[in-house]
Amino acid sequence: MHQYELMVILDPEIDERTVAPSLDKFLNVVRNDGGTIDNVDIWGRRRLAYEINKKSEGIYAVVQLTATGDTTKELDRQLKLSEAVMRTKVLRADEAIAQVAAAQKRADEKAARKAAAAEKTVTEKVGV
């Protein structure tokens, strides 16, 4: 079993009070296969970066769970069949951490190059 993170964007037309119970229905797939739900974090209504199904907002939810790969595939399949679900993304937690670390490393390297270039420019101006 592995740790996974699931992000779901739900249709903004559904009532926000029904988000948790409807998610719980889907998460029973994980529980029935012997997995566990570690954390459910409902972010609420947020503006989308781009329109999905002609909608500019969505209700975001992030779920941390422990399950097998087959269980997460079945969960993702069932979520995609629901009309209330606009988008889903399932990531293995260790892969997500590696992606964040790689992005941070690239940002640090870029900042270091920028600082070195700025220092070189200042040194050249002072030396002239």
From Swiss-Prot:
GO biological process: translation
Keywords: Ribonucleoprotein, Ribosomal protein, RNA-binding, rRNA-binding
GO terms assigned for molecular function: small ribosomal subunit rRNA binding; structural constituent of ribosome
Gene Ontology cellular component list: cytoplasm; ribonucleoprotein complex; ribosome
InterPro entries referenced in this protein's UniProt entry, alphabetically: Ribosomal_bS6, Ribosomal_bS6_CS, Ribosomal_bS6_sf, Ribosomal_S6_plastid/chlpt, Transl_elong_EF1B/ribsomal_bS6
Family named by the database record: Belongs to the bacterial ribosomal protein bS6 family.
Protein name (record): Small ribosomal subunit protein bS6
